[in-house]
Amino acid sequence: MEIVLVVDDEPDIRTVVRSMLTAKGYTVLETGDPQQAIRMATQQAVHLLITDVVMPLMKGTELARRVQEVSPWTKVLLMSAFKVAEITASGLPFIPKPFTPEALVDRVRQILAPPTPFARPSPPNPTPNA
């Protein structure tokens, strides 16, 4: 199963997210320290980083950038209770707090789903010469 790294300065949020995702079979790592999150991402494969945007030690968008520098295959989901302009500017997937377990799990599944191949339209059938 996929490994998800949850980073939030609020321990209660990390606990809730961990509980929601482990119930669905995900392996969840967590930390409140963005620097530790970067170290964790370099030490083992992390499929998805879920990070709060507004944290005192480092913004979530900066953490996402730095994790993807050391682990380019790691996908990112930003979360925040605030409307932050840099969320939109980042172009990264986002889920607003508070969220339901179903909303979080659905968002995680969407992000981790393998890409679907581009469906090319069938060429038109040639018309027989009349």
Report residues per predicted region:
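Receiver (REC) domain active-site loop signature in two-component systems and cognate sites
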Residues: 55
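CheY-like receiver
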Residues: 115-130
